[in-house]
């Protein structure tokens, strides 16, 4: 095996069904250094650009400004959500590691669903880790965060962000890559909400009403 091409010979290090505990290190230009880091990659915006055969000078890859094309951010002043995403990951990881379901601070119905999705030996399609993590993030923010100091800080941040964008519509977005099964995550969210709403009709945390908007290019 060529030590200079380790990344290209084995680019995938983790199982899609398990916690991503390793990653390939990338340099400032988004190129692989051929070094494996024994921990999860932090959330960040990376756009790997193929290295040209001839390069006169070394340039650092310029960050992309994410402002939905509205000109709301510039290179000098831009909105960067990655710090709070990484912070949320930390708290969800810590919560996930709690062994006793009675200490999860969720409803018994939610606890049973989590145990099923995390540990059931599915005979057909098994949920990917990223699908379960997306659901866990929504559950943690809804059921756990209101009872913790760190959680309340997240909720305040989300409320302020929503007030700046659209004060009349509280929104929470979950971003998953193409092919990771976003439709399945929507179904899991609906199941979680519906079961709890039926058992707790007076709770404002859960609902039985859903609006599903889908593009016409999904097959």
Predicted regions and their residues:
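N-terminal accessory nucleic-acid engagement/regulatory domains that precede
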Residues: 1-124
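Conserved pre-motif I regulatory segment
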Residues: 97-175
């Amino acid at each position: 095996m060529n030590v200079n091409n380790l990344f290209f010979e084995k680019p995938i290090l983790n199982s899609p069904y398990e916690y991503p505990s390793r990653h390939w290190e990338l340099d400032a230009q988004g190129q692989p250094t051929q070094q494996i880091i024994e921990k999860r990659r932090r959330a960040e915006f990376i756009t790997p650009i193929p290295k040209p055969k001839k390069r006169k000078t070394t340039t650092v890859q310029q960050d992309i400004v994410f402002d939905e094309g509205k000109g709301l951010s510039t290179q000098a002043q831009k909105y960067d959500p990655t710090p709070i995403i990484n912070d949320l990951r930390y708290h969800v990881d810590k919560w996930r590691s709690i062994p006793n379901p009675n200490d999860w601070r969720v409803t018994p119905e939610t606890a049973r669903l989590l145990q099923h999705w995390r540990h059931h030996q599915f005979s057909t399609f098994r949920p990917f880790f990223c699908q379960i993590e997306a659901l866990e993030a929504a559950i943690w923010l809804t059921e756990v965060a209101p009872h913790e100091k760190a959680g309340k800080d997240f909720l305040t941040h989300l409320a302020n962000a929503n007030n700046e964008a659209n004060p009349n519509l509280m929104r929470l977005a979950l971003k998953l890559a193409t092919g990771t099964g976003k439709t399945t995550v929507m179904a899991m969210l609906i199941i979680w909400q519906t079961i709890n709403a039926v058992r707790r009709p007076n709770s404002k945390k859960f609902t039985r009403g859903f609006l599903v908007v889908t593009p016409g290019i999904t097959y």
